[in-house]
């Protein structure tokens, strides 16, 4: 299977989205289609042996829209994809830029519409509202002048808003009517009725019925109604487009962080400023204080503190010295340094993050399926309701004017856009907010599923703990007379001499502690490993050893009773040291618990989530760790082999409820993939963890709780928008049709209908924008 992303042009509402989806889904070989109305894009999974990108574009064209491939799932990028691969994030065009350009064009249309609408509305409604009008518009002999003036003022409004008519009637011709069709038919009906009235007026004037002609002009001209409908819809579209342009603010901010130029250091030491898109892997670059790092790389010389908050959400700058990795779009705060470029263009962490978020926006949340089904039949149903409304009003009143007023009101008040925007706008804002927090959702489905997770399984190593053993206790042995066997420093020197040649994780922890304290390991002789026990060696005239209780007993070095068990109960592994057959001391090593683990588990509990810890450690050690983070023994799954993690997740799923798995992605990929939602934690710049649905860039367990809160807030926002969109149409359409006329005696004007329709979409987008201010309440 291949996956391609396409730019789709001509979509203006949810009905358009549904028609494109339907047209492509019908093709043989197409497995899934996800159309994003907001971004004007489409993601298609298909079998290249059965269908090609050209076939997909042709299907979209036949549906009345345009499509072009962005980049191919097979790895061969299209034109836009190639540009991104060369230039990376610094030159990526975001949906925000497109929306800002659309808003600018819409503003021009709006200004022209308003300029001509004001005099049109004044002239058309002045006689009804008692406004003063020039005599040429009130004199009965000039009724045709009034009509022609209104028509002339309407023409520029129709001209700048011709897209509604072109797209609307085109969709009708393809048998797939859209919101533009509703507007086009509604406005055309008003204009057609007015032109018909002008013919009647001409006949009346020709036969000397001057007074009747003036009455016809006052009662039967709807030019101002058509102009108002078009102008108000354009007001709504402009506000909607402006609001939508703000939804991608988080990604836009990331793109803006990428510098356009960089300083390349040549072999002779000379420095040259070049465009970022010309940088190649292996080149050496210099970054000065205050500058953004242009590409990913490894520090060669110098040191600095680098602000990585844009990528990871971590507010404290990271210290960078020789050998440390640096990432594009992070900011150098203090010193100057040189680094070698390792990943450039579309391979940088920044470009991958942006692509991941955009791909997530291109997917569809399960909650959107109901809205899509409604949108797919919405417009045809509205046309039927409008036709029925016209016929009923004609039958009841015999008045074409009243029947036309209600029929047009039904057309223009209906709004499938509000339905279509509810999900994608909230998803875009939610995923963008997540990116700001260092939480990357790979799909809209993951964002939705996380909200309903009932159990979170935490892989202990690297998730609850740091994943790297460290020295926790240094205990010097006591002789029979109560004096210490040696000093703490001497014990560490002894340990360093024995462990310098070992590759055991415990040895690495001890050597790291010695290095921190400035202790240099001495050379030893006759070094030997004792399988299952430890190591022995000779240092000068002294025989030294390091190992477990069994080795100490064999050497005659007496270990205090219960000491090993005491450390084990605390989740620590003791390593005993002997010198010339006497116990010299004990160094305990443990995988340290992260500072926020206990707080994070408490936060998850307060969110109503059951927490389990999964580990390969023995139960005694596992329960010791569990106690430190607030978990009971029943919540611990111990003695688990890496290959069995997936089975335990499956068993929890079989017990009922959705399960999320949190791990570092190293040996738990099958478990991450098996879970309803897999979260890879502490990935830093490595965001492409296989099997993970959500990537947590920081090694902070609190981000799991934050991700759940964000998921719940986003889905709650979507439900609010869907409710109000359905409620609006459920009330608005019957009101426009005149269902409540017997009770209220009031008939809705098409102009009010157009205003209400415009505001409904603006309200949906504005509600989604509230997510930009989201702050976790529990996981602060």
Describe the residue ranges of each PLM region.
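Transmembrane helix-loop-helix hairpins at the membrane interface
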Residues: 103-261, 373, 474, 745
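Membrane-embedded alpha-helical bundles of multi-pass transporters
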Residues: 129-144, 173, 177, 192, ...
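Juxtamembrane coupling segments of multi-pass membrane pumps/enzymes
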Residues: 201-205, 210-212, 227-289, 320, ...
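Flexible metal-binding regulatory segments at protein termini and peripheral loops
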Residues: 1-147, 244, 270-273, 351, ...
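Soluble-to-membrane junctions at the N-terminal ends of transmembrane alpha-helices
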Residues: 92-115, 167-190, 354-386, 403, ...
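Conserved ATP-binding TGD loop and adjacent catalytic N/P-domain core of P-type ATPases
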Residues: 1, 282, 289, 363, ...
């Amino acid at each position: 299977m291949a996956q391609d992303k396409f730019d789709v042009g001509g979509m203006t509402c949810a009905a358009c989205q549904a028609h494109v989806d339907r047209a492509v889904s019908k093709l043989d070989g197409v497995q899934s289609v996800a159309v994003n109305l907001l971004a004007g894009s489409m993601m298609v999974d298909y079998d290249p042996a059965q269908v090609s990108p050209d076939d997909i574009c042709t299907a979209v064209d036949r549906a009345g829209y345009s499509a072009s491939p962005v980049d191919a799932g097979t790895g061969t990028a299209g034109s836009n994809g190639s540009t991104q691969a060369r230039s990376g994030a610094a030159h990526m065009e975001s949906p925000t830029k497109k929306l800002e350009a659309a808003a600018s064009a819409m503003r021009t249309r709006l200004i022209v519409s308003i300029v001509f609408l004001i005099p049109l509305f004044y002239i058309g409604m002045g006689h009804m509202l008692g406004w003063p009008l020039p005599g040429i518009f009130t004199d009965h002999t000039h009724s045709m002048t009034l009509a022609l003036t209104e028509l002339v003022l309407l023409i520029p409004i129709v001209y700048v808003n011709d897209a509604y008519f072109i797209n609307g009637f085109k969709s009708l011709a393809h048998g797939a009517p859209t919101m533009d069709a509703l507007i086009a038919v509604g406005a055309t009906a008003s204009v057609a009725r007015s032109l018909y009235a002008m013919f009647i007026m001409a006949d009346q004037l020709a036969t000397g019925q001057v007074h009747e002609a003036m009455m016809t002009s006052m009662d039967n001209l709807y030019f101002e109604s058509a102009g108002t409908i078009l102008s108000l819809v354009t007001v709504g579209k402009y506000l909607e487009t402006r609001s939508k342009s703000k939804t991608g603010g988080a990604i836009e901010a990331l793109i803006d962080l990428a510098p356009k130029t960089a300083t390349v250091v040549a072999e002779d030491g000379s420095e040259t400023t070049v465009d970022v898109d010309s940088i190649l892997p292996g080149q050496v670059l210099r970054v000065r204080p205050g500058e953004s790092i242009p590409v990913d790389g490894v520090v060669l010389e110098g040191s600095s503190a680098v602000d990585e908050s844009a990528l990871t959400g971590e507010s404290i700058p990271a210290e960078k010295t020789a050998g440390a990795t640096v990432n594009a779009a992070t900011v150098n705060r203090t010193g100057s340094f040189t680094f070698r470029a390792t990943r450039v263009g579309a391979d940088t962490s920044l470009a991958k993050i942006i692509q991941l978020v955009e791909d997530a926006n291109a997917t569809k949340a399960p909650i959107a399926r109901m809205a899509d089904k409604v949108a797919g039949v919405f417009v045809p149903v509205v046309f039927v309701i409008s036709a029925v409304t016209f016929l009923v009003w004609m039958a009841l009143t015999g008045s074409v004017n009243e029947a036309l007023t209600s029929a047009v009101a039904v057309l223009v008040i209906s709004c499938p856009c509000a339905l279509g925007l509810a999900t994608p706008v909230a998803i875009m804002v939610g995923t963008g907010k997540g990116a700001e927090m260092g939480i990357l959702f790979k799909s809209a489905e993951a964002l939705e599923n996380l909200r309903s997770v009932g159990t979170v399984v935490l892989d202990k190593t690297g998730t609850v703990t740091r994943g790297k053993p460290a020295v926790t206790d240094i205990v010097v042995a006591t002789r029979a007379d109560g004096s210490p066997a040696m000093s703490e420093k001497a014990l560490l020197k002894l340990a360093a001499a024995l462990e310098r040649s070992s590759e055991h994780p415990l040895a690495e922890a001890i050597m790291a502690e010695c290095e921190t304290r400035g202790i240099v390991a001495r050379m030893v002789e006759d070094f030997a490993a004792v399988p299952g026990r430890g190591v022995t060696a000779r240092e000068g005239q002294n025989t030294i050893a390091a190992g477990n209780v069994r080795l100490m007993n064999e050497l005659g070095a007496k270990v205090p009773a219960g000491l090993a068990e005491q450390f084990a109960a605390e989740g620590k592994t003791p390593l005993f040291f002997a010198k010339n057959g006497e116990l010299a001391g004990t160094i305990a090593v443990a995988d340290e618990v992260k500072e926020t683990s206990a707080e994070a588990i408490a936060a998850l509990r307060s969110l109503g989530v059951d927490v389990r810890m999964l580990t390969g450690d023995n139960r005694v050690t596992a329960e010791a760790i569990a106690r430190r983070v607030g978990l009971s023994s029943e919540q611990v799954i111990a003695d688990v082999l890496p290959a069995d993690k997936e089975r335990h997740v499956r068993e929890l799923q079989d017990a009922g409820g959705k399960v999320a798995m949190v791990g570092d992605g190293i040996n738990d990929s099958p478990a991450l993939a098996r879970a309803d939602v897999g979260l890879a934690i502490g990935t830093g710049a490595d965001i492409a963890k296989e099997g993970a649905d959500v990537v947590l860039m920081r090694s902070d367990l609190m981000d799991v709780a934050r991700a759940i809160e964000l998921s719940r807030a986003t889905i709650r926002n979507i439900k609010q928008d869907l409710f109000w969109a359905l409620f609006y149409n459920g009330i608005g359409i019957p009101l426009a049709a005149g269902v409540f006329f017997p009770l209220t005696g009031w008939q809705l004007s098409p102009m009010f209908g157009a205003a209400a329709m415009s505001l409904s979409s603006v309200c949906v987008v504005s509600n989604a924008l509230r997510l930009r201010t989201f702050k976790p309440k529990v996981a602060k």
